[in-house]
Amino acid sequence: MAPAGGPRVKKVILERLDSGEVVVGDGGFLFTLEKRGFVKAGLWTPEAVVEYPSAVRQLHTEFLRAGADVLQTFTFSAAEDRMESKWEAVNAAACDLAQEVADGGAALVAGGICQTSLYKYHKDETRIKNIFRLQLGVFARKNVDFLIAEYFEHVEEAVWAVEVLREVGAPVAVTMCIGPEGDMHGVTPGECAVRLSRAGANIIGVNCRFGPWTSLQTMKLMKEGLRDAGLQAHLMVQCLGFHTPDCGKGGFVDLPEYPFGLEPRVATRWDIQKYAREAYNLGVRYIGGCCGFEPYHIRAIAEELAPERGFLPPASEKHGIWGSGLDMHTKPWIRARARREYWETLLPASGRPFCPSLSKPDA
């Protein structure tokens, strides 16, 4: 199967999902740009779209080339409650950068909002909704293709976000940063999905906080909740690019390695191919990644689901499927690795003989 030749036809998100198409999301911006020296850890705010636009543009381009069908605006934590006077310029620049890169292909642009810093201490629905509306106003002026409310740990605030995003008539996706135990108030994943569907979300799922397998467990519970309530919604998953089976209800932020010691936990490209296949088999059709997801992880999703999509991403021109490019190596034991069975059964070592396999969460 050859890489796609030239730009594909740009179709709206719900048209794609309604027809059963796979939609490949993009990956993580905060962690990747922090490692590259353009985002400050702790604050995790996206001033880079104004300060270092070429760095953000480059990452968008890498995700697009890797096979992403959607480019999210780099607007995580870009609400007025976190950025004060900078918020409007940052949101506008983020939209422009994503749109500029998307215009080079068939990618859609999604305007993204996330949970506020206010909810935990001041559950003021009116004030929080107004914060969402400020970002929404920029997205509407910039004519993004659809909207995503992501990284919500309380379903009540996620519902408020959906209600606001629906005000402009664009399709709305919503993802919560929860695991199988549910939100931080104990609302189950199934009930979260039901409330979000009834609030009007078109696409429902999870993002961040948890690794591939935990995220898929949560998606299964969401799917069951929707089914039992007689509701229908498209499903979406954008997990971490890290293995986190030992984290608690709060996810990877409670692990002692967060955020600067997570590299030994990075998922391999083959892990992500398995994740993509299992997500697809579960009925999820919008599949991407969040923190820790690099462009090669997105390529892994696109390659695994190439039979369903009908094409490979441009970045596959430089990648042998399941290591097939290794058959040209001069060393026979490396040539022997040019096969799927080898990489699917490999148990990779960390090279750290005195380190534990798992950690104990701090919270």
Curated annotation (Swiss-Prot):
Its EC number is 2.1.1.10. Keywords: Metal-binding, Methyltransferase, Transferase, Zinc. GO terms for molecular function: S-methylmethionine-homocysteine S-methyltransferase activity; zinc ion binding. Zn(2+) binds at residues 208, 290-291. GO terms for cellular component: cytosol. Residues 11-305 form the Hcy-binding domain. Pathway: Amino-acid biosynthesis; L-methionine biosynthesis via de novo pathway; L-methionine from L-homocysteine (BhmT route): step 1/1. InterPro entries: Betaine-hCys_S-MeTrfase_BHMT (IPR017226), BHMT (IPR051524), HCY_dom (IPR003726), HCY_dom_sf (IPR036589). It is an enzyme of class 2 (transferase). SUPFAM superfamilies: Homocysteine S-methyltransferase (SSF82282). Its cofactor is Zn(2+). Binds 1 zinc ion per subunit. Involved in the regulation of homocysteine metabolism. Converts betaine and homocysteine to dimethylglycine and methionine, respectively. This reaction is also required for the irreversible oxidation of choline. This is S-methylmethionine--homocysteine S-methyltransferase BHMT2. It comes from Rattus norvegicus. The lineage of its organism: Eukaryota, Metazoa, Chordata, Craniata, Vertebrata.
